[in-house]
């Protein structure tokens, strides 16, 4: 009884006074007016959806959250996730269903890496709660006890074109969130006093994230529009806007505003500006090792170089070899399970405000499921690093469902994305360290088969710089490869040399940016003939990248070897041969060109 009374007393003390409550109501109405004016001026936008959440936003920003208005990127500020990347909002989530995953990454970073007081708030629409990625995020947050995370479900029942099946069945939303292990609070989203109460309750919860299920109405406060269908995404007609604004203004009782609470300044000072390779790669020329394993070893080494390096994996760590990082840095490894969309979103959240250097690992084929998150990461100008293993038909017996043959096309389409395609363990280690230090998204494509060491430990690598690894004055054709096909090109060069035919062989190292200058100069030195060979479909891969790079050179011809057709299960060597990218097929291509 005493505990209950104490709890009630605490709740009473947390209540704002009547003047503060009125200011919060007035600020909500000002937000409605701003949304109407802004969308009318731009002839685009969502004033109706904004109106449903106005009280939620007013209470959050002017009563609950702690932040410095003049310093929106301050690491101690509370975080808020909505739909656009503004100065205060760290990630773009305009395509629905992604915000909560990013919020999970921010909350995980705050709780486990920063060990700081800042909290994370994410506004989730009832419409987007139909996206599976939302439920991946709900499961993740519960599993990791993210009690510094609050998700606010804006349940206004209306969709873009109709009504949701659940409409205002608030109890169903409540039960679903509770089933996923969340502390769930139901509230009238129009009642600022009730909102203040539930957000206070959320702050008291330990070891569980909190879901606030708020019953709201689209178009709240707008006559003939509130809770009406077919208004989504439409500005108010300009001939009605002035009258609506005057009506809302008549409900405002004060000109006062509220200042947000100052943040608690307890985030650690960190430095991720330059992470140096502490020693050269430790490999011998006689070593044989898969680039996927070399990548895992490189991540562990990188983790020793900087304690803000983290690794995420989607339950493939014993195949991607990210488990090596986990063994050496267990407190900085995040298991995301089979939920690739959420894994990428969590990584996006972890790297915001420069708090971590994150690498997310899985099979390259599985990253295609997260293309939506990757695309929005590009729009957010994120610094995440993605590692895709088991690329191409060279993975062998696992079959076509596991073979990434579209991933280069996918990542080449992302603005400012750097694509590494290392061909041996030494270049892989350099790719990892380079990715850790460059701004923008990075993708590292690794292979399953064990391959020989090509480079010496002293070799240096740069982004956008290809390597000419076989050349002579007698070279007839330039062969461009990367990863497994580079080794096939070297084997073809060895066999052809016995016939007195010399090939020039180029290792791209980075597919994007492409070293066009090196490719063009070497092609001109070998009669203008280029053969590209890749473990990827023809569309969007190395061949098309090289063709685009030399397209303005009239005397250069590109011959393209790639995987044509749906692959099958088999031995790696058999599949390379079956799909026309083995050393034998390179030799045949050379012979055909020279016969002409």
From Swiss-Prot:
It catalyses: D-sedoheptulose 7-phosphate + D-glyceraldehyde 3-phosphate = aldehydo-D-ribose 5-phosphate + D-xylulose 5-phosphate. Thiamine diphosphate binds at residues 49, 94-96, 127, 156, 218, 232, 340, 366, 402. PANTHER family: TRANSKETOLASE, TRANSKETOLASE-LIKE PROTEIN 1. Pfam families: Transket_pyr, Transketolase_C, Transketolase_N. InterPro entries: THDP-binding, Transketo_C/PFOR_II, Transketolase-like, Transketolase-like_Pyr-bd, Transketolase_BS, Transketolase_C, Transketolase_N. Coiled coil: none annotated. It is an enzyme of class 2 (transferase). This is Transketolase-like protein 1. Belongs to the transketolase family. One of its GO terms (cellular component) is cytoplasm. The record marks 46, 232 as: Important for catalytic activity. It comes from Bos taurus. Substrate binds at residues 46, 232, 292, 319, 390, 398, 448. Mg(2+) binds at residues 126, 156, 158. It is found in: Cytoplasm. Keywords: Calcium, Cytoplasm, Magnesium, Metal-binding, Thiamine pyrophosphate, Transferase. It comes from the Eukaryota. Its EC number is 2.2.1.1. PROSITE patterns: TRANSKETOLASE_2. Catalyzes the transfer of a two-carbon ketol group from a ketose donor to an aldose acceptor, via a covalent intermediate with the cofactor thiamine pyrophosphate.
């Amino acid at each position: 009884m005493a505990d209950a009374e104490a709890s009630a007393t605490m709740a009473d003390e947390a209540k704002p006074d009547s003047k503060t409550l009125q200011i919060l109501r007035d600020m909500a109405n000002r937000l409605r007016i701003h949304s109407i004016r802004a969308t009318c001026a731009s002839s685009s936008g969502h004033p109706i959806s904004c109106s449903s959440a106005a009280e939620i936003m007013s209470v959050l920003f002017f009563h609950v959250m702690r932040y410095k208005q003049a310093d929106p990127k301050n690491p101690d500020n509370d975080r808020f996730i909505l739909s656009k990347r503004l100065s205060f909002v760290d990630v773009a989530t305009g395509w629905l269903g992604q915000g909560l995953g990013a919020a999970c990454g921010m909350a995980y970073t705050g709780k486990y890496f920063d060990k700081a007081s800042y909290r994370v708030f994410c506004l989730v629409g009832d419409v987007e709660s139909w996206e599976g990625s939302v439920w991946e995020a709900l499961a993740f947050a519960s599993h990791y006890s993210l009690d510094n995370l609050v998700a606010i479900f804006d349940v206004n029942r209306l969709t873009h074109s109709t009504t949701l099946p659940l409409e205002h069945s608030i109890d169903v939303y409540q039960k679903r969130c509770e089933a996923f292990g969340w502390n769930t609070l139901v509230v009238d989203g129009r009642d600022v006093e009730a909102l203040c109460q539930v957000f206070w309750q959320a702050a008291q919860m330990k070891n569980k994230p909190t879901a606030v299920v708020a019953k709201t109405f689209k178009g709240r406060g707008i006559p003939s529009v509130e809770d009406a269908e077919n208004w989504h995404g439409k500005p108010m007609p300009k001939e009605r806007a002035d009258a609506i604004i005057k009506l809302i203004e008549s409900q405002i009782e004060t000109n006062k505003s509220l200042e947000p609470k100052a943040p608690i300044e307890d985030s650690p000072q960190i430095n991720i500006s330059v992470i140096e390779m502490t020693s050269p790669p430790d490999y011998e020329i006689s070593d044989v090792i898969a680039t996927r394993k070399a990548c895992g070893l490189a991540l562990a080494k990188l983790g020793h170089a900087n304690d803000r390096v983290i690794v995420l994996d989607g339950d493939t760590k014993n195949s991607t070899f990210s488990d090596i990082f986990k063994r050496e840095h267990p407190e900085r490894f995040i298991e995301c399970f089979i939920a690739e969309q959420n894994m990428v979103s969590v990584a996006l959240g972890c790297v915001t405000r420069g708090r971590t250097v994150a690498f997310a690992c899985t099979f390259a084929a599985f990253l295609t499921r997260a293309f939506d998150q990757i695309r929005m990461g590009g729009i957010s100008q994120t610094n995440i690093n993605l590692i895709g293993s088991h690329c191409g038909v060279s993975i062998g017996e696992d079959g076509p469902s596991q073979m990434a043959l579209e991933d280069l096309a996918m990542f080449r389409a992302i603005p400012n994305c750097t694509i590494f395609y290392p061909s041996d363990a030494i270049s892989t280690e350099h790719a990892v360290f380079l990715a850790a230090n460059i701004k923008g998204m990075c993708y590292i494509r690794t292979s399953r088969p064990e391959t020989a060491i090509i480079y010496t430990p002293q070799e240096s690598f740069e982004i956008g710089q290809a390597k000419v690894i076989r050349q002579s004055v007698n070279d007839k054709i330039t062969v461009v490869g990367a990863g497994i096909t580079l080794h096939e090109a070297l084997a073809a060069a060895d066999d052809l040399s016995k016939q007195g035919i010399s090939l020039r062989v180029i290792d791209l190292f980075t597919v994007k940016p492409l070293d066009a200058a090196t490719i063009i100069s070497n092609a001109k030195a070998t009669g203008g003939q280029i053969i590209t060979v890749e473990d990827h479909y023809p569309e969007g891969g190395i061949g098309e990248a090289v063709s685009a790079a030399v397209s303005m050179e009239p005397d250069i011809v590109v011959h393209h070897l790639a995987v044509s057709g749906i692959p099958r299960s088999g031995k790696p060597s058999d599949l390379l041969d079956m799909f026309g990218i083995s050393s034998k097929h390179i030799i045949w291509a050379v012979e055909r060109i020279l016969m002409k």
